[in-house]
Curated annotation (Swiss-Prot):
Task of the protein: Forms part of the ribosomal stalk, playing a central role in the interaction of the ribosome with GTP-bound translation factors.
GO CC terms: cytosolic large ribosomal subunit
Protein name, entry field: Large ribosomal subunit protein uL10
Source domain of life: Archaea
Complex formation: Part of the 50S ribosomal subunit. Forms part of the ribosomal stalk which helps the ribosome interact with GTP-bound translation factors. Forms a heptameric L10(L12)2(L12)2(L12)2 complex, where L10 forms an elongated spine to which the L12 dimers bind in a sequential fashion.
A Pfam family recorded for this sequence: RL10P_insert
Record gene name: rpl10
SUPFAM superfamilies reported in the protein's UniProt record: Ribosomal protein L10-like
């Protein structure tokens, strides 16, 4: 009798459910990552678009939570870890890819749908100028309520100029919904919200799946800049650093040579320019007290002092600019990461 009761019980299980569990079990075993997404309020036709987009990269299944639980147990997954996420209508995404990269796709991949009552505009909702294709009639009063200027031409309603019917954050007027649909305007964005990812035994909640790529990039750039500045300061011998270090040392050497009057082919011009500037300055200082017997070229003096001042400014700028440029940072990061 027990065997008969068991056989009758087994017959009550629909064959499609057995096939579904079998397929799910194989998908779980052959996937490195499983993501569970919330299907509540998500349009079915948009899910079809996602399937097409992820073809070859992931398998998307809409199934009952109970069947997934059975399949997960069959595949050796501790279902208790996922129990809290298996409520309401869900979609299951099976992939071999990294869970963070896959979640990033869903974060960035937004789809449009027609507006429904109560929807808020994420951007300006505009009824464009031109032929609406709608026959003149009661619809004119609807356009009037929306303050959209119209005219009737060849029995059709024409919008005179582009008109904003909702600004970002505004509830889209109910009167505008049928018009927007007839014009094929989809002002609302939707995206599939991921609840959790299961990756090789690790449960990763949705809030932990989000990556701040701009923040990471900024941190790496800042770290590279600081490291480069320190390397230049201590003359750390690497090809990228030495290029800046040698230039800095050369300028310091020229500045020192011009200060002490040490003449070399490289420093001669700087030494002579500095000496001439000092001579003019001294002559100017004592010219009022002693007749030097020469006429001081005051214009030349100011001109000769100006390059020296500009040279000092340039040297000061070079001293302040201890870090590499944006192009050099990008080049360095490229070589760092291959």
């Amino acid at each position: 009798m027990k065997r008969l009761a068991l056989a009758l019980k087994q017959r009550k299980v629909a064959s499609w459910k057995l096939e579904e569990v079998k397929e799910l079990t194989e998908l779980i075993k052959n996937s490195n990552t499983i993501l569970i997404g919330n299907l509540e309020g998500f349009p079915a036709d948009k899910l079809h678009e996602i399937r097409k987009k992820l073809r070859g990269k992931a398998t998307i299944k809409v199934t009952k939570n109970t069947l997934f639980k059975i399949a997960a147990k069959n595949a050796g997954i501790d279902i208790e870890k996922l129990e809290q996420y298996l409520t309401g209508p869900n979609v299951f995404i099976f992939t071999k890819d990294n869970p963070f990269i896959t979640n990033m796709f869903f974060e960035n991949y937004k789809l449009r749908r027609y507006a429904m009552p109560g929807d808020k505009a994420e951007e300006e909702v505009v009824i464009p100028a031109g032929d609406t294709g709608m026959p003149a009639g009661p619809i004119l009063s609807v356009f009037g309520k929306l303050k959209v200027q119209t005219k009737v031409q060849d029995g059709k309603v024409h919008v005179v100029k582009d008109t904003v019917v909702a600004k970002p954050g505004d509830v889209i007027p109910a009167e505008a919904l049928p018009i927007l649909q007839k014009l094929g305007i989809m002002p609302v964005y939707v995206k599939l919200k991921i609840k959790v990812a299961y990756h090789e035994g690790l449960v990763i909640p949705a809030e932990s799946l989000k990556l701040d790529l701009e923040g990471y990039r900024s941190n790496i750039t800042e770290a590279y800049r600081n490291a480069f500045t320190l390397a230049v300061e201590i003359a750390y011998p690497t090809p990228d650093v030495l290029k800046f270090t040698i230039s800095k040392v050369f300028k310091n050497a020229i500045a020192l040579a011009s200060e002490i009057g040490y003449i070399t082919p490289e420093s001669a011009q700087a030494v002579i320019s500095k000496a001439v500037a000092k001579a003019y300055a001294l002559a100017t200082a004592i010219g009022g007290k002693v007749d030097l017997g020469v006429q001081l070229p005051t214009v030349q003096q100011s001109q000769s002092q100006q390059p020296a001042a500009e040279e000092k400014k340039e040297e000061k700028k070079e001293e302040e600019k201890k870090g590499p440029s944006e192009e050099e940072i990008a080049s360095g990061l490229a070589s760092l990461f291959g």
